[in-house]
A protein has these predicted regions:
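Acyl-donor (CoA/ACP) binding surface of acyl/acetyltransferases
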Residues: 1-18, 53, 57-212
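Conserved GNAT-fold acetyl-CoA-binding loop/helix
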Residues: 19-41
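Short, conserved alpha-helical segments within structured domains
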Residues: 27-31, 52, 123
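Short loop/turn motifs at secondary-structure junctions and domain boundaries
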Residues: 44-49
């Protein structure tokens, strides 16, 4: 779905669950302002074709449940970075794994990057487990400076294009994850020529159910 200014309010709503702040690099008092800055930065990145943000919603209820970002690294040419936020009510339902699938796929197949890096909080055991299970390589802990001072401890994970094609694509096919051909074309068009001032539309990779 489209990246819009109103998504700042959505992220603020998610943050009202105290558990949310255990897994993001913001502190509670700064959430409203930083949530707005977060969306402003996402829109600016889209306009400059540096990063692409998508919000995923439930097919059943239409409720927005998560956000995933694919961004070209500012520091290293040929490398992309993936980040995501999942609404607390949607935790432990497998969405983080699906978002990671999509983020990796988008970076390798649409942005044509040679490697993708994903950071996870050192204390976030669930995220670290997912990334290791998908075959990303841990590069060890690092310090991440916080806007309000101090730092957080992060684990950085990396996967190369060859590893994605050899290891992860067969796993995606075995688990019957797929993107319809029409949506592949839409995603490619968005990556090559995103509209100014707003996000595009895409269907997150979904589990295809065989007809009974």
């Amino acid at each position: 779905m489209r990246v819009e200014d109103r998504h700042a309010d959505l992220i603020w709503e998610w943050s009202r669950d105290p558990r949310f702040n255990q897994h993001v690099l913001w502190t509670q008092p700064h959430i409203p302002l930083q949530a707005k800055r977060f969306i402003d930065a996402a829109l600016a990145a889209w306009d400059s074709r540096i990063g692409f943000n998508y919000f995923a919603e439930s097919k059943e209820s239409g409720e927005t449940l998560a956000r995933v970002e694919a961004r070209r690294s500012r520091r290293r040419k040929g490398i992309a970075e993936v980040g995501m936020l999942v609404a607390p009510k949607a935790w432990n339902q497998g969405f983080a794994k699906e978002l990671t699938y999509f983020g990796l796929w988008f970076c390798f197949e649409n942005l044509e990057m040679e490697a993708v890096a994903i950071d996870a909080g050192a204390a976030n055991g669930a995220s670290n487990h997912i990334l290791e299970d998908l075959g990303l390589h841990p590069l060890g802990e690092q310090d991440f400076p916080l806007a309000e001072g101090g730092y957080a401890r992060l684990n950085r994970f990396v996967m190369t294009r060859d590893e994605f094609q050899v290891r992860l694509m067969p796993k995606l096919e075995a688990e019957e994850y797929q993107l319809p051909a029409e949506e592949l074309a839409k995603a490619q068009a968005v990556a090559e020529n995103p509209p100014v001032g707003q996000g595009g539309e895409i269907v997150i990779a979904e589990r295809a159910r065989a007809a009974s």
